[in-house]
Amino acid sequence: MCSEARLARRLRDALREEEPWAVEELLRCGADPNLVLEDGAAAVHLAAGARHPRGLRCLGALLRQGGDPNARSVEALTPLHVAAAWGCRRGLELLLSQGADPALRDQDGLRPLDLALQQGHLECARVLQDLDTRTRTRTRIGAETQEPEPAPGTPGLSGPTDETLDSIALQKQPCRGDNRDIGLEADPGPPSLPVPLETVDKHGSSASPPGHWDYSSDASFVTAVEVSGAEDPASDTPPWAGSLPPTRQGLLHVVHANQRVPRSQGTEAELNARLQALTLTPPNAAGFQSSPSSMPLLDRSPAHSPPRTPTPGASDCHCLWEHQTSIDSDMATLWLTEDEASSTGGREPVGPCRHLPVSTVSDLELLKGLRALGENPHPITPFTRQLYHQQLEEAQIAPGPEFSGHSLELAAALRTGCIPDVQADEDALAQQFEQPDPARRWREGVVKSSFTYLLLDPRETQDLPARAFSLTPAERLQTFIRAIFYVGKGTRARPYVHLWEALGHHGRSRKQPHQACPKVRQILDIWASGCGVVSLHCFQHVVAVEAYTREACIVEALGIQTLTNQKQGHCYGVVAGWPPARRRRLGVHLLHRALLVFLAEGERQLHPQDIQARG
């Protein structure tokens, strides 16, 4: 098991780096893409967040070699949930093409469509909604017509001719001259006749030798081509690219060919084991236009090498040879982005393929940016840098600036008013400390004299309990969250320690308060405005470690940047081993319970004269 976990961790490292050759090598070594690790997720869940072509190739490699598109994490999330929540439309389409079930729900009862809508990823939501609509339409039409299904050996492309190709996924194909593998696959279902890619030269003539292909269909299909460039490569082409064949350095474009679909000689069973039929939309009268939901791929084979007929043992020919490098792997497969395909109309060549620009943000700036958004990132390494940079970019462009700094879980609750149903998690937290083991040395002992408290700014609440009836649940929660400026753990012996500290600064000259901590300065500012501080006590009569754990979950949900707390809290017991997302959901749940306490008790302000100074 230790060896399996180690391989799975290495596989996830390769996925973070988006290195397809390393992913394939680890899969051949036996790495399990569906193995859930200690953080609650498997490699296939991490790969589902792919956005760039290299990441999509990694996801395709996992799905080809045993990756389950419906694998569950400890939170019952599937890869489709991950892709929908992160707004990764291409990864979502690829998973759907491999049999991902959009009807599965996570532990909160949410479908991928629900997550896409909550996070504002409209393209992903549209794909899932269209899929649901088409599925219901086909089911209704099928029930009305009762047409017989075509025989498995019927020539032609599979699926109805008017069905749009929503995704194209990588599928293993027989080796080419460079000992690499690539292919295409589409809608899941019984495979039909294989449709190998045909390589053409820059004049459009077929490079296949006469008699090598058996023509079996007149259907139109889209061919992805590499066109050898006659001009000198661009100045930013890497120097090592000159050693590649001319077709590797050429321009790329997608053409529409009204020609026959070739079928390689050999047994149909061998070919069907490696390729699945493509489901394509026939071109309209105005000519072919690339669909915004399709992903153009290219043939990696040399310009004059037709796909070979597979031979026994061909499944082993995709291994990484010793003389091949990752650089060759990167250049061997070139992709068109959606923007390039749409700007050229799918007909004209585009400029030379360029690598994605390397981020100029330093590690320190990246850490500061994530912490400013309420995140608590681990140390940045070459494996985590790209993931954190993507997370920072998405958070910066996410809608709802009034929720910036809060966790994604709390931001979703603030937008919708829906609170995660994690009462079972709170019960598990409380159960462990109901009768704590006296043999263990718990922090501050096992006396049940602690509680969690929130300091609120009444200038934000505006007597929220009195006017709550006129607000929606989301508005009540938003007002409550905006008012919180400190979360702490208190005891009955020291219930107002921070207010006492602020009282010591009260009345001094204005030159001195800046020496106080941010929390005290906030209290002094509230008092200076003529208001009092609201100290909300909740979750009382618990041992210290339980109060610390509740405090930590709440701080994680709120985001420390939105508070005057100077450090993150500490979790104890079973909660310490939970994934951060699970702790944040519990924090949102606890905040909602604290809101209910506040609404029930009413707003009580504490002014300087209300605090008894210590002797």
From Swiss-Prot:
LEM domain ranges (all copies): 355-399
Location(s) in or outside the cell: Cytoplasm; Nucleus
Main location: cytoplasm
Superkingdom assignment: Eukaryota
One annotated GO biological process: regulation of lymphoid progenitor cell differentiation
Extent of motif Nuclear localization signal: 579-586
Keyword rRNA processing: no
UniProt repeat feature ANK, residue ranges: 39-71, 75-104, 108-137
GO molecular function: DNA endonuclease activity; endonuclease activity
All copies of domain GIY-YIG, residue ranges: 448-566
Distribution of this protein across tissues and organs: Expression is predominant in adult bone marrow.
Broad class of enzyme this protein falls into: hydrolase
Pfam families listed in its UniProt record: Ank_2 (PF12796), LEM-3_GIY-YIG (PF22945)
Residue numbers covered by motif Nuclear export signal: 271-280
Subunit record text: Interacts (via LEM domain) with BANF1; the interaction may favor BANF1 dimerization.
Functional summary from the UniProt entry: Endonuclease that probably plays a role in the DNA damage response and DNA repair.
Domain notes per entry: The LEM domain is required for GIY-YIG domain-mediated DNA cleavage and induction of DNA damage response.
Name under which the protein is recorded: Ankyrin repeat and LEM domain-containing protein 1
